[in-house]
Amino acid sequence: MGSEKEQRPEAHLPEEGEGAKPWRVDGSKDSQITPREDHGQESLLAGLHGTHPPKTRQKVTAQAGGPGDPMLFSSPETDEKLFICAQCGKTFNNTSNLRTHQRIHTGEKPYKCSECGKSFSRSSNRIRHERIHLEEKHYQCAKCQESFRRRSDLTTHQQDHLGQRPYRCDICGKSFTQSSTLAVHHRTHLEPAPYICCECGKSFSNSSSFGVHHRTHTGERPYECTECGRTFSDISNFGAHQRTHRGEKPYRCTLCGKHFSRSSNLIRHQKTHLGEQDEKDFS
């Protein structure tokens, strides 16, 4: 059985230019790199320090660990360091690039796409891949066929169909479909409302709500339906009205199948089913 030195294959630095001779490391720790032929030293140093070999010779040392470990080559005169892959001999100027390269040999893919589970060896490749999901709409609502890019967006949308409002304000009891909407609402209790109506004194936390309310005093109705000429002060009511002309009823009751043009009408309707259920429970 041979010694460790005999078992370990020689690690070669990449050749630089014509006539350069390969250098080798004997595998021992803190070993000095020696040329197979004496005149090859200038070619090695040209690769380490630039395109032109220095006039004076420098010592270049190599630190080697166990078999398969990367080797560190350094020049004491310039403090320049190169990290070499023990598998293929390719060199890198920092350990981060070396580790990324070594995943080619190990097959390691630590970066996983949260949407489809596909794995990648580089984080940049994963980011590039995830943009595909942002451009596609894979998640379709079975109720109204509207599509979404993210599963979480579909879940939020489906709560509108079901009339579910799982996020409840612990101060006033008002419920919301999204936690972010609840957070915005909750600030209205903690912060003084900056928008106060000079007509009735009612206060509002945002300018859009204040504007809708203020139009009830002024009588302004800026949203006009081109089909029938009816006007509205609130854009959401205007949008719901337009759906009546188009025959759209995207809000469907999952209990009886009835459709509605407004989510508020669906919620009001579903309460009738809850009342029926209460009567059955007590019968």
UniProtKB/Swiss-Prot annotation:
It comes from the Eukaryota. A zinc finger (C2H2-type) spans 83-105, 111-133, 139-161, 167-189, 195-217, 223-245, 251-273. The keyword Phosphoprotein applies. One of its GO terms (molecular function) is DNA binding. Residues 1-68 are annotated as: Disordered. It is found in: Nucleus. Keywords: DNA-binding, Isopeptide bond, Metal-binding, Nucleus, Phosphoprotein, Repeat, Transcription, Transcription regulation, Ubl conjugation, Zinc, Zinc-finger. The keyword Repeat applies. Gene3D superfamilies: Classic Zinc Finger (3.30.160.60). There is a cross-link at residue 81 (Glycyl lysine isopeptide (Lys-Gly) (interchain with G-Cter in SUMO2)). Residues 1-41 have a biased composition (Basic and acidic residues). GO terms for cellular component: nucleus. The modification Phosphoserine is found at residue 43. PANTHER family: PR DOMAIN ZINC FINGER PROTEIN, ZINC FINGER PROTEIN 22. May be involved in transcriptional regulation. Belongs to the krueppel C2H2-type zinc-finger protein family. This is Zinc finger protein 691. It comes from Mus musculus (Mouse). The gene is Znf691.
